[in-house]
């Protein structure tokens, strides 16, 4: 009887671990279908009069996901001028790198790079940085779930890792 209990207990532990590992792995937001909003960045990445930055899923071809980068030139007068450009991303599961193929427009005008280091991510946020150095410029992207209030742990990581972090408040006028 004790052997049977031991076997049942062992089976339960193994199943629990497998279930936890399967359910516990977060989805990479850069390659799923959710829209991501720029929630913060290093001050070196600041572009005057550029706001309302978001990226939207378009499609997937093989391992590459195509996304649009949408932003507006904000001025004192309206209407604002909306701009958009396409880029592709690829992520190998558990890799620390996010590969990017940007259009000429996105690369030349917004400084997109071919690789970004994934500092941390979860189903609803993504913190990216350049590969150059330990405290390199970075950007924080979140889903709609976190646009109004970024959880403290994510915020703390953003402020610790990113040099001269600048939060980007969510502006209702951007996303009617």
Swiss-Prot record:
Cellular compartments annotated: Secreted
UniProt tissue specificity: Expressed in salivary glands.
Coiled-coil region list: none
Chain sites annotated for binding cholesterol: 47
Keywords in alphabetical order: Disulfide bond, Glycoprotein, Secreted, Signal
Cystine residue pairs: 52-174, 138-162
Signal peptide: 1-24
Gene3D superfamilies: 2.40.128.20
InterPro entries, per the entry: Calycin
Glycan attachment residues as annotated in the record: 59, 155
Entry superkingdom: Eukaryota
Gene Ontology cellular-component terms listed: extracellular region
Family: Belongs to the calycin superfamily. Lipocalin family.
Note: Does not bind to any major populations in peripheral blood mononuclear, including monocytes, B cells, T cells and NK cells, as well as to other blood DC (not differentiated from monocytes).
Protein task: Salivary tick protein that modulates host immune response. This protein blocks dendritic cell (DC) differentiation from monocytes. In addition, it inhibits up-regulation of costimulatory molecules and pro-inflammatory cytokines in response to stimuli and promotes up-regulation of co-inhibitory molecules and the anti-inflammatory cytokine interleukin-10. It has a pocket to accomodate cholesterol, which may have immune-modulatory roles, either directly or through interactions with the host gut microbiota.
The protein's assembly and partners: Homodimer; non-disulfide-linked. Each monomer accommodates one molecule of cholesterol in a pocket.
Comment, domains: Each monomer contains a pocket that accomodates cholesterol. Cholesterol derivatives (such as epicholesterol, epicholestanol, epicoprostenol, or 7-dehydrocholesterol) could also fit in the pocket with minor rearrangement of the side chain. Since arthropods are unable to synthesize cholesterol de novo, it is likely that a cholesterol ligand would be bloodmeal-derived.
Protein name: Japanin
Organism: Rhipicephalus appendiculatus
